[in-house]
Amino acid sequence: MTKSRVLLANVHIMMAYAFRSLERIDDAPRSTAEFEHLHDLLAEIIVSETSRQVKRGLDHGYREETRELQTVRGRIDLQGSIRQRSFVRGELVCRYDEFVADTDMNRAVRATVLLLARHGNVAPQRREALARLLPFFAGVRAVNPQAIRWKDLQLNRINASYRWLLAACELTVKGLLPT
């Protein structure tokens, strides 16, 4: 396949029209880049959108945890404490909500970044850029890209900035994985 030069602004503007977010047209990069394969173009979009999202802050959510603790945190699970005999060790079983970055959207982004970095036809510099993004997803557990339910990822006004990123991720996963 031959290399083709693509004006990134054109791709950015087409995405802005496709997602009805015309306010993003002004953010379009003014450079051109060479892409040998479609994976290269998608990797560039994912790198720029993920970097943008990391700067804004990753989406966080609450996950319920149950642990034996020496101090009270959240609600005391009296039945669990009796069952595990925590009182003998001077501990209590507590149920509490933990504010974590391990959300469905972050799992989808992490899975896509890993998929592109490992299996995509991506230029070495973009592969390195993808690898540099992974430490930001250290607290996010890995999932199988085929198991991602794209329709179940709910966007609201708080996480609406994920819209472009998730669309690029879905395109990448559906294009890279055999059906």
Role assignments for model-derived ranges:
Residues 1-178:
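Terminal, charged accessory segments of proteins
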